Regions:
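N-terminal, active-site-proximal structural segment of metallo-dependent hydrolase catalytic domains
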Residues: 1-47, 62-63
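Active site of divalent-metal-dependent phosphoester/diester hydrolases
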Residues: 51-70, 140-198, 202-212
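Active-site neighborhood of phospho(di)ester-bond hydrolases with catalytic His/Asp-centered motifs
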Residues: 28-32, 54-55, 131-135, 161-165
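Active-site-proximal beta-strand elements of phosphoester/diester hydrolases
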Residues: 1-10, 92, 96-107, 133
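Structured beta-strand-rich core segments of catalytic domains in phosphoester-bond hydrolases
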Residues: 32-105
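Catalytic metal-binding/acid-base residues of hydrolase active sites
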Residues: 9, 34, 104-106, 136-139, ...
Length: 222
């Protein structure tokens, strides 16, 4: 099973291009979708055989997460919303025996509650068939508080950081803003539990290099 994550930055990427650069994954998780782009991706991906598995949204939030899948979801209670800070920004589902948790963290001073909500879930799922993927808005090398905290939880709870063996090593980054003062950062991450020992990460910078988003895509092969 292949799972693609991409922060679209509210852009409407041609779905054929999305699938080609994303190497035709089985499951697609997209972040930062306005209502218009939600309709764009739902229609375009439906024609390619993907079902919009997410609950309906009645209002527009820039960090909406949406899950599109060619594979059947194994649970009816698919998604959880965890408090105001992660409402609509944390979705969980189970596909082919794997729990997929997709996250889009807030920025700056709004991270404390969301990270504290992630901690107990991470502690329970580290020994399981679980994938945690998304835009954490946290570069471990540049965020002095939450970067080390995230990596500490990953290590303490038995998760594996898929960046450790990904192409590009420590020099790879996933985000570069448009302002001159913006530094390249690795803020998109993928972690797997102990029962997914063969999982690997493929970094897809073409989304960023071609101007389709200012984020790279992450493709996890399970």
């Amino acid at each position: 099973m292949k799972v693609l994550f991409l922060n679209t930055r509210k852009k409407r990427i041609d779905c054929g291009t999305l699938l080609r650069i994303g190497r035709r994954p089985d499951v697609i998780v997209l972040a930062e979708l306005l209502q218009g782009s939600q309709r764009h991706y739902e229609a375009g991906l439906a024609s390619a055989g993907y079902e919009n598995c997410s609950q309906a949204a009645f209002h527009s939030r820039k960090r909406h997460l949406r899950v599109y899948s060619k594979l059947k979801l194994e649970t009816d209670t698919r998604f959880s919303r965890q408090g105001n800070k992660l409402q609509n920004n944390w979705v969980r589902c189970r596909i082919k025996g794997v729990t997929i948790s997709a996250v889009h963290m807030p920025t700056l001073g709004m991270k404390r509650k969301p990270f504290n909500q992630l901690k107990p879930w991470m502690s329970k799922q580290g020994a399981c068939r679980a994938l945690m993927i998304g835009d954490f808005n946290t570069d471990p090398a540049q965020d002095p508080k939450w970067g080390p905290q995230l990596i500490e939880w990953v290590n303490d709870f038995g998760w594996r950081n898929l960046w450790d063996k990904a192409s590009g090593g420590t020099k790879a980054y996933t985000f570069k803003g448009t302002r001159k003062s913006d530094k390249p950062r690795r803020i998109d991450h993928a972690f797997v539990g102990k029962r997914l020992p063969k999982a690997r990460l493929i970094h897809l910078p073409a989304f960023r290099l071609k101007g389709l988003s200012d984020h790279s895509g992450l493709l996890v092969v399970l």
